[in-house]
Amino acid sequence: MALKNKDISSIIKERIRNYKIEKINDEVGKVISIGDGIALVSGLKNVKNGELIIFNESVYGLTLNLEIDYIGVAILGNDTLLKEGDEAKRTFEVISIKVGPEILGRVINALGEPIDGKGEIDSEIHRQIFRVAPGVMARESVNEALSTGILAIDSMIPIGKGQRELIIGDRQTGKTAIAIDAIINQKGKNVKCIYVAIGQKNSTVAQIVRKLENHGAMEYTSVVSASASELSPMQYLAPYTGVTIAEEFMETGQDVLIVYDDLSKHAVAYRTLSLLLRRPPGREAYPGDVFYLHSQLLERAAKVNKENGGGSITALPIIETQQGDISAYIATNVISITDGQIFTKESLFNSGQRPAIDVGFSVSRVGSSAQISAMKEVTSSLKLQLAQYNEMLAFSQFGSDLDDSTKAILENGSKIYEILKQDQYSPIDQYTQVILFLAIKQNLINPIPLEYISKFKKAIIHKFNKDAKALNLKTLIRNDKKLSTKLRNEITKIIIEEIKNITKSIANYNPKDHRPIPEEYAKLVESK
């Protein structure tokens, strides 16, 4: 039946009469798809990048993609609670966390929520986790040492407060051990520490927390954990949460050490997120902005001037390599961002040289400006001595006829490497280190057989930490930060006495089988 004009006109009039003006709310949207921790949401036209979205009044998400018809949201919680058609609301807020001294001694997740069962964090201070790094004019040059307690690092690869020093190497070569030892060594030095675990096993993180507690380090340390069982968005956010906690301390004039363990897993988490958000992949399937991902994070580590708080953040990012390949994409990215790298080598680790630091490949671009004068003086030629030793070691494989100077280089080098060996969780203070390296520099270790070098090292550490006279000399180094001729001579006398005690205790020891102590130092004891 055809409609007449009159009927059409009455229908239109009826529709106009009953029409209600409804305001379209562009602050509330709908989930159009959900999966793998990513939700696509339509209807939120004015949302900002990095803004928090709330689903069903309970689950939060982070806006990462802004498309014409929909937005991509990373779910920060259990995505199984969501389904297509669920409501999504803007919060008009970006992610912020609680910061301040109350967070020390606690284990938190990437959202700043406590996961250690010790109750809520009682802090009123909140900070946004995505912030711009301090500008050039807000910074100061790095000129103060951050002692790690590790002989090889403090002598040849010195780290300064405000520096970014990469720890890079294959898996199971002691990278985390170096970082944990550095944290333990900050006890009593008024340095706050943050350990960020990205993609680690929960059991590994629990073990690290226990070790820090056993050594009294949790008093000044906070642990941020985004374990392997958590979704990619949480692993992506964890390092930014860690550095945000550190920035609060830096801006109140305090020094902070932050460890990112590790940024390889962080890059993988970001790659996963990017691929799920349908961003175009680049080299090794990483997105084009993966360099910026790490540069914006590591540039937040700095030594700032007094107008900006006067504190510092020292960063120790960790990168895992495959088969010692430091030319991989993420490895070269982070090497170019940081101020040097500590390279751990599997062959050294397996040969018993621990920490397994390859001194030849490792470098600190801050250099000796971060060392006290005494350390600078006694370690100036150490790297060269080890380079000569490694060169001669390769050369000596081809022939047994070696001259005396080559034998001396090989013997001295092997003794230095023996002194550089160090057990985990046993950091040595930098003033005791100065004394050990003085013994090397002055060739006082000549008469000691290689197998007794570790005994000599223990004797010196014990002597200069227990004996009143020796302890007084160490205090003078701490106060003056340099070695006067008189102080050097007094320390040399004590070292020679300890060497004599060791050689006397060796059965069938023949001094003629070993090079003597240089005459100028031997005289000091004889003339006493």
From Swiss-Prot:
It holds the Pfam family ATP-synt_ab. InterPro entries: ATP_synth_asu-like_sf, ATP_synth_asu_C, ATP_synth_asu_C_sf, ATP_synth_F1_a_nt-bd_dom, ATP_synth_F1_asu, ATPase_a/bsu_AS, ATPase_F1/V1/A1_a/bsu_N, ATPase_F1/V1/A1_a/bsu_N_sf. It comes from the Bacteria. ATP binds at G169, D170, R171, Q172, T173, G174, K175, T176. Signal peptide: none annotated. It is an enzyme of class 7 (translocase). Keywords: ATP synthesis, ATP-binding, Cell membrane, CF(1), Hydrogen ion transport, Ion transport, Membrane, Nucleotide-binding, Translocase, Transport. It is found in: Cell membrane. It catalyses: ATP + H2O + 4 H(+)(in) = ADP + phosphate + 5 H(+)(out). Its main location: membrane. F-type ATPases have 2 components, CF(1) - the catalytic core - and CF(0) - the membrane proton channel. CF(1) has five subunits: alpha(3), beta(3), gamma(1), delta(1), epsilon(1). CF(0) has three main subunits: a(1), b(2) and c(9-12). The alpha and beta chains form an alternating ring which encloses part of the gamma chain. CF(1) is attached to CF(0) by a central stalk formed by the gamma and epsilon chains, while a peripheral stalk is formed by the delta and b chains. Produces ATP from ADP in the presence of a proton gradient across the membrane. The alpha chain is a regulatory subunit. NCBIfam families: atpA, PRK13343.1. This is ATP synthase subunit alpha 1. It comes from Mycoplasmopsis pulmonis (strain UAB CTIP).
